[in-house]
Amino acid sequence: MLSDTHISGDPQAVSRGVNMADHLRAAVKEVTALAPAPLSVLIDGDCALGHGFPEDYTTWLDLLQPLRTSGLPLHCTLGNHDDREVFWNALKEAASQPRPVQGKYVSIVESGVANWFLLDSLDTTNHTPGRVGEEQCRWLASALDARGEKPALVMVHHDPVVHADGKAPGLLDTQELLAVVLPRKHVKALFYGHTHTWRLAEQEGLHLVNLPAVAYNFAPNEVTGWVDCHLQRDGMTLEVRATDPQHSVHGQMKRLAWRA
């Protein structure tokens, strides 16, 4: 699982002291070297640096080409620095997929032990807050109810976190999303990015997994990199793969058990 790659059309571009293309290139190299090969690669939004220009996605796809050459299925969500129409034009297989939610890019990735539900929280390009929306919440509820035989894992870009004042500045309709996933006990985890932070939490037994950014951090000591996810029947194991192998959380493994 990768998040917040923030790729510019210029592969030499630097932001916050980081060459984002170098970070993604290193992550891709590590993922393609995994043995056995992963069943899928998930990228959790903010694929592009700022406005989601066509050239951003051209460079992004060039950097991801080793994954595609290796035959690894690639699945994405969209974040606030993406442009949905430009993304669809760049990634032809995404453009050709069914669109069960009008104007949103959603997908279901099925595996032997769990089903993944990838949401679209892009509201307005290059504006920070995100929104799932009523139609997408209804679609998710229906899709979850139709697939209750396996654990369900939901991925969205924006952080579904309600602050002490009752507001959710990341995902504006966090409460509406939680109203869908919390009562459905076969939903075991909710993954998100956006904050460029690696963090684990729980709400009513639902695991909340904040993925680190591939690109750059906001806090000086925060890790950048990606997360290797191994699913089991009764839970999952997450391993942090830091860009800097000397980082204190590089190689950290967390075992998360499914709620009953």
Residue ranges and their predicted role:
Residues 1-55, 149, 163:
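N-terminal active-site segment of His-dependent metallophosphoesterases
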Residues 154-160, 188-198:
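Histidine-centered catalytic micro-motifs
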Residues 53-147, 151, 173-186, 201-212, ...:
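Extended active-site neighborhood of metal-dependent phosphoesterases/phosphodiesterases
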Residues 7, 49, 123, 160, ...:
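Short, glycine/acidic-enriched loop or turn micro-motifs at the edges of active sites
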Residues 145-164:
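Short acidic, glycine-rich surface-loop motifs adjacent to enzyme active sites
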Residues 4, 45-46, 79-80, 157, ...:
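Active-site glycine-centered loops adjacent to acidic/histidine catalytic or metal-binding residues
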Residues 230-260:
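A short C-terminal boundary segment appended to hydrolase-like catalytic domains
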